[in-house]
Every structure is written in structure tokens, then in C-alpha cells.
């Protein structure tokens, strides 16, 4: 493989939890983890250059608000606009880390410029429970039954296999984003 090609792979934090056992929680986590394993092997076998960036609950303008790929923030925004109760999967204490889409774009650009063939993670330092996020919207809350495959804790790790994951700093905060959303809607 001598094509001077570089890939920036959008990895997922969904497959990192519970010492790797979360890789089988969903088809999404499963395929993302297998793709990453393939990239790791392509580097070992052929010297293939890539950067992997682990994204954490991306939010921002024009995010998906309905359907299987909807983001939790997108769902809450739609429910807020429709003046419906925000739906939270029981018990609501599931924690997540969040990343604004502008931090994703800036992070991808910085990684591309560095060209170091590393793994990176990008997320706001603070974790929030889904219930705490819902409360930030100052709306009624309705609890849904627990779901199979639900992760209960945000998973941040420092290594995948023997590869160090380098943290990238975020500029944007989910609290500020939600407050701004409420103020403008």
C-alpha cells in the first residue's frame, strides 16, 4: 500500500466501556470497533497511516432529532420545541460526555495538521447524567422503560490495546449550548 493516503477515522466511545465488552452492546458499537481493529492491523501489516478520533455524544446545530440515529440533545430539542415532556430512559443516572460539533471540526483539523498517526479523544471534561441534561431544559420529564444495550457510564479510557489515546481540549460547553438554545427558542 504505497498511495500516500491518510484516513481520519471517526471512532466511537460507545465501544470503549467495560474493558471492551461494550463492543457488542449494539450493531453500531460492534462495527465501529471492528473497523478500528482493521485499521490497527493495516498499520502493523502495511504501515497504513491513519488518525482515530473518539467522539463523545456530538451535539450542535442541525443535529438529528428523530429516528434511530437521533442524538439525545436533538431529541430533547425537538421535544422542547413541541412543548412535550422530555423522555429519559430509566433511571436517568446514565452519565455521558458531550462534544460540540465545532470542537469536532477543530479537533479533526488539528489532528490532520499534526500528522502523528495517533488515537485521540475529544470531549468536554465534565460528565452529566441524562437526567441532569434534561433538567437543563426546564421542561417536564417522562421516564421510559430501561432499554437493552443501554450504557450506564460514560467510558473514557487512556489506551486501546497498547495504543495511547491523546486527549484534545474542547472550547464549547453543553450547559452554555442548552441555555443559548432555550434563550433563542
Language model regions located:
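Active-site beta-alpha turn of Rossmann-fold NAD(P)-dependent dehydrogenases/reductases
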Residues: 8-13, 54-56, 92, 123
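Conserved beta-loop-beta element that borders a ligand/cofactor-binding pocket
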Residues: 11-12, 38-62, 87, 141
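Alpha-helical substrate-binding/gating segment
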Residues: 58, 74-87, 95-121
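Glycine-rich Rossmann NAD(P)(H)-binding loop
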Residues: 58-62, 88-98, 120-128, 135, ...
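Mid/C-terminal beta-alpha module of Rossmann-like enzyme folds, strongest
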Residues: 82, 105-149
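Conserved C-terminal active-site "lid" loop/helix of NAD(P)H-dependent oxidoreductases
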Residues: 101, 129-132, 147-180
Amino acid at each position: 500500500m504505497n498511495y500516500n493516503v491518510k484516513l481520519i477515522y471517526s471512532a466511537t466511545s460507545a465501544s470503549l466501556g467495560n474493558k471492551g465488552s461494550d463492543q457488542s452492546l449494539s450493531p453500531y458499537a460492534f462495527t465501529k470497533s471492528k473497523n478500528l481493529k482493521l485499521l490497527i492491523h493495516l498499520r502493523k501489516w502495511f504501515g497504513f497511516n491513519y488518525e482515530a478520533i473518539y467522539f463523545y455524544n456530538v451535539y450542535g446545530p442541525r443535529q438529528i432529532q428523530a429516528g434511530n440515529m437521533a442524538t439525545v440533545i436533538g431529541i430533547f430539542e425537538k421535544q422542547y420545541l413541541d412543548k412535550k415532556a422530555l423522555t429519559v430512559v430509566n433511571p436517568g443516572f446514565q452519565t455521558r460526555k458531550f462534544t460540540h460539533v465545532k470542537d469536532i471540526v477543530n479537533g479533526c483539523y488539528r489532528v490532520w495538521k499534526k500528522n502523528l498517526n495517533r488515537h485521540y479523544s475529544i470531549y468536554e471534561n465534565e460528565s452529566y447524567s441524562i437526567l441532569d441534561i434534561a433538567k437543563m431544559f426546564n421542561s417536564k420529564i417522562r421516564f421510559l422503560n430501561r432499554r437493552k444495550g443501554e450504557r450506564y457510564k460514560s467510558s473514557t479510557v487512556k489506551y486501546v490495546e497498547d495504543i495511547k489515546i491523546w486527549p484534545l481540549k474542547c472550547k464549547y460547553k453543553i450547559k452554555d449550548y442548552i441555555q443559548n438554545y432555550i434563550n433563542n427558542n
